[in-house]
A protein has these predicted regions:
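Membrane-embedded segments
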Residues: 74-147
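Short alpha-helix in the alpha/beta-hydrolase fold that links the catalytic acid
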Residues: 106, 214, 223, 237-246
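C-terminal catalytic histidine-bearing segment of alpha/beta-hydrolase fold enzymes
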Residues: 242-243, 250-284
């Protein structure tokens, strides 16, 4: 350890030669630690998986059923009431907290508008096997979308909520299924942008292993996109939704801001007229 005196520390330690090498090594070591630990750091703040598989009694209480179940695995949940959908099918990717079962509140308003809604479940959520991460979620989402199209045909739409917007955007870019439109609720622009606002002192591009770059993924999306933001979003400040919206192709986008709503309570502020406007736009 060097104790600073009036004359300063020896040049061999702090000088241009020795000190420069020392500081570079320290920064290099810090970068290595951040990069090697990046996946763990990212996953701790981004994913909250659980093994709470819905029971038969739970599903019956909400009039839901497993969709595309195979052994102990399943792709998602579906309402028993809207099998004969007149408006098409919506594949819905939920946020990073909770499970598909917790998103039953989507079924009634969208079902009333004639949509069949598949509440897609992620790997390692809701008792499903697999692992978390963008690569895993997007690959799983692509297969879920393919199967939905196989089962029900067109039109098929994607709806993303929070993290699910990033999944939906990536799926929309990579799929060969002809999508009719896209709905994004409380979205971000890029994961790096969100991480930078949360951790301004970290080199987030080195730490992050997932990208979820919705700006890049949607820049050539050919159909209409409805973007819905919450005015008082305390988790993903609404500026991220605005930044994404500004980047989207002109003439094929529309944005709604739900007054007084936060990131998690916005459903209480979304009435039937809002749902109709949002879905009517993507149906054009």
């Amino acid at each position: 350890m060097c104790y600073v005196s009036a004359g300063g520390c020896p040049t061999a330690f702090w000088g241009i030669e020795g000190g420069g090498r020392f500081m570079k090594k320290q920064w290099l070591l810090l970068m290595i630690i951040l990069v090697l630990g990046g996946c763990d750091m990212q996953n701790r703040f981004l994913y909250f998986p659980n093994d709470d598989r819905p029971t038969a009694a739970m599903l019956a209480s909400e009039n839901m059923a497993f969709w595309r179940a195979a052994g102990q695995d399943y792709r998602g949940l579906i309402s028993k009431e809207n099998e004969a959908a007149t408006s098409g099918t919506i594949v819905l990717f939920h946020g990073n907290g909770g499970t598909a079962f917790d998103r039953g509140f989507y079924l009634e308003p969208l079902g009333n508008l004639g949509f069949r809604v598949i509440l897609a479940e992620y790997p390692l959520y809701g008792g499903r096997p697999g692992k978390v991460g963008e690569k895993s979620f997007v690959a799983d989402g692509l297969e879920t979308l393919r199967l939905a199209h196989e089962d029900y045909g067109e039109p098929v739409y994607l709806l993303g909520e929070s993290l699910g917007c990033g999944v939906a955007a990536a799926v929309a870019r990579q799929t060969s299924v002809p999508l009719a439109g896209l709905i994004l609720i409380t979205p971000w622009d890029t994961l790096a942008s969100v991480a930078k606002s949360l951790f301004p002192f970290l080199p987030v591009k080195l730490v992050l292993t997932d990208r979820y770059d919705s700006i890049e993924n949607l820049k050539n999306f050919p159909r209409n996109i409805s973007v819905v933001g919450a005015e008082h979003d305390e988790i993903l400040p609404i500026r991220h939704a605005h930044q994404l919206y500004q980047s989207l192709p002109e003439g094929r986008k529309r944005m709604w801001v739900i007054p007084n709503a936060g990131h998690n309570d916005w459903p209480y502020y979304a009435d039937a007229s809002l749902w109709k406007e949002i879905t009517d736009f993507v149906k054009k």
